[in-house]
């Protein structure tokens, strides 16, 4: 599923991401934009053999199990396939675990490079939330 910007913002808000660990909703919407272009089915292969999955491009080396990543940890305790569902509940649950890990949203390269330090409120502007 490819979400509309405001549709995604509303879903993320409903699932408790607004100000989760101090990160406003705009940060999460911005991260999703630049990680997956709001597409739940996005996947990207990394040079280390791991793969990033879903709307927030969650990595199989640490966070989920795809059955093909050497030395995978599966900290979120989920198959990576659930991160590709239209329903983002599991992706959000895992993202909460990731952002609680010490590096905050710096875990997402696209967030660090394109959202951090910018006016992320623009990502939720005009949305009925």
Curated annotation (Swiss-Prot):
Disulfide bonds join 6-127, 30-115, 64-80, 76-94. GO terms for cellular component: extracellular region. Pfam families: Lys. It is found in: Secreted. One of its GO terms (biological process) is killing of cells of another organism. Lysozymes have primarily a bacteriolytic function; those in tissues and body fluids are associated with the monocyte-macrophage system and enhance the activity of immunoagents. Keywords: Antimicrobial, Bacteriolytic enzyme, Disulfide bond, Glycosidase, Hydrolase, Secreted. Lysozyme C is capable of both hydrolysis and transglycosylation; it also shows a slight esterase activity. It acts rapidly on both peptide-substituted and unsubstituted peptidoglycan, and slowly on chitin oligosaccharides. It catalyses: Hydrolysis of (1->4)-beta-linkages between N-acetylmuramic acid and N-acetyl-D-glucosamine residues in a peptidoglycan and between N-acetyl-D-glucosamine residues in chitodextrins. The gene is LYZ. Monomer. Its main location: secreted. CDD domains: LYZ_C (cd16897). This is Lysozyme C. Belongs to the glycosyl hydrolase 22 family. It comes from the Eukaryota. It comes from Aix sponsa. Residues 1-129 form the C-type lysozyme domain. GO terms for molecular function: lysozyme activity. Its EC number is 3.2.1.17. The active site is at residues 35, 52.
């Amino acid at each position: 599923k490819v979400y509309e910007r405001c549709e995604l913002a509303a879903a993320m808000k409903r699932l408790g991401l607004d100000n989760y660990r101090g990160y406003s909703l705009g940060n999460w919407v911005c991260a999703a934009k630049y990680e997956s272009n709001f597409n739940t089915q996005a996947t990207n292969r990394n040079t280390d053999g791991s793969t990033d999955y879903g709307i927030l491009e969650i990595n199989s080396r640490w966070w989920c199990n795809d059955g093909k990543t050497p030395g995978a940890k599966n900290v979120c305790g989920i198959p990576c396939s659930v991160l590709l569902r239209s329903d983002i509940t599991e992706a959000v649950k895992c993202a909460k675990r990731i952002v609680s890990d010490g590096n905050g949203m710096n875990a997402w390269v696209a967030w660090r490079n394109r959202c951090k330090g910018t006016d992320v409120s623009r990502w939720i502007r005009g949305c009925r939330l």
